[in-house]
């Protein structure tokens, strides 16, 4: 009898432990160096698209992004990384992690400014993809319209480097050969690129004859470049977007359309995207003038009812940086991940993470939010211009 009682008691303890372990947690501290703790939160979300809103060029955000992405790849089957980059940038990044381009190749990577955390993520992806079947590899897609002229130039030279254009007419052959051999970016920008755009607009069949399956990549880069120029025009040719202006709305439309196209081309894949936090909100909530939030962001449209991602989207907002403990002497900037449906904001008198939205439930804006222990100590990443991949390896 005593043995039966002990067995029953042991079973009850195990059952209680399992219930406690499996029950969704309201918060969890995350180890930025290892990612430990993420599984205790996100394992309950079986979404198809995970979107993270970051503060650009901040080390702690990049560390969390890396840990989160690795977890989603290994535990959730995510295989597509969506980037806030133009199509040309994403294409060259993808060629690198597919191990078709080396990290110090002449095409593209001398155009990038990247950090140690970026390098570590791309190197990890490259190693992950080695000796895997194509269907199991990680790929990268840029869905923004922000390619620089240098990136478009590098992309065109790379795409056309070994092509045989003989199936196209003579005029198309001459244009593509000139682009292939062009050694001066200014000539490409002023002469060859306008001709490529005209060909794409008036006679795309010749591009398809010349490039076959590769034509679609050139067409999307040319389309993205045109959209980027239109956005620049709508912004009165200013480098920084006016948050309440028509350029922002135009860019959000492009982000939405491009992500939808990528999803519809591969509707069974799982995706992770890292974007500026202003783009990542599930519901509009800020009406104040000068707000850093974007009205009608592309994510808010994807999260709406009857959207193509309705019920398949998980949003983690990293813009929330209220102080959650007294500022101390700690060297580590601890990060806590909160489930907005279960947790109350410990750093706000209102008890809400989104204090500027008193009438909107937190969970309708993002399913998860991040709070740093010392938000004033979040550090800027050490960016490295030029051939970073090669330079970093040699350090």
What are the residue ranges of the model-derived segments?
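Compositional signal for N-terminal targeting/processing segments
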Residues: 17-395
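N-terminal Sec-pathway targeting helices
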Residues: 1-12
């Amino acid at each position: 009898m005593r043995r039966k009682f002990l067995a029953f008691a042991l079973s009850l303890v195990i059952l209680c432990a399992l219930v406690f372990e499996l029950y969704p947690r309201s918060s969890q501290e995350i180890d930025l160096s290892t990612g430990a703790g993420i599984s205790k939160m996100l394992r309950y979300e079986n979404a198809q698209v995970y979107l993270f809103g970051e503060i650009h060029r901040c080390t702690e955000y990049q560390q969390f992004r890396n840990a989160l992405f690795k977890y989603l790849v290994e535990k959730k089957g995510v295989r597509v990384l969506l980037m806030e980059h133009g199509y040309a940038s994403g294409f060259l990044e993808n060629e690198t992690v597919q191990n078709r381009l080396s990290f110090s190749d002449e095409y593209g990577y001398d155009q990038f400014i990247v950090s140690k955390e970026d390098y570590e993520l791309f190197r990890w992806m490259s190693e992950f993809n080695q000796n895997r079947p194509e269907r199991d590899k990680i790929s990268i897609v840029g869905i923004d319209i922000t390619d620089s002229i240098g990136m478009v130039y590098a992309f065109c030279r790379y795409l056309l480097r070994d092509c045989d254009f003989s199936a196209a007419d003579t005029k198309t052959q001459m244009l593509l050969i000139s682009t292939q051999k062009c050694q001066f970016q200014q000539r490409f920008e002023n002469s060859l690129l306008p001709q490529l755009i005209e060909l794409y607009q008036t006679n795309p069949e010749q591009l398809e004859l010349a490039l076959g399956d590769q034509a679609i990549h050139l067409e999307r880069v040319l389309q993205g470049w045109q959209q980027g120029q239109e956005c620049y025009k709508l912004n009165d040719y200013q480098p920084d977007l006016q948050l309440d202006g028509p350029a922002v709305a135009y860019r959000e439309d492009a982000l939405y359309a491009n992500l939808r196209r990528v999803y519809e081309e591969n509707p069974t894949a799982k995706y992770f995207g890292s974007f500026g936090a202003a783009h990542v909100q599930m519901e509009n909530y800020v009406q104040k003038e000068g707000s850093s939030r974007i009205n009608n962001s592309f994510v808010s449209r994807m999260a709406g009812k009857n959207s193509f991602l309705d019920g398949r989207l998980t949003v983690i907002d990293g813009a929330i940086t209220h102080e959650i403990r007294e500022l101390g002497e700690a060297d580590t900037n601890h990060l806590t991940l909160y489930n907005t449906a279960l947790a109350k904001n410990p750093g706000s008198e209102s008890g809400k993470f989104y204090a500027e939205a008193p009438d909107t439930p937190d969970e309708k804006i993002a399913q998860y939010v991040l709070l740093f222990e010392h938000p004033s100590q979040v550090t800027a990443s050490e960016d490295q211009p030029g051939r970073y991949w090669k330079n970093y390896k040699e350090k």
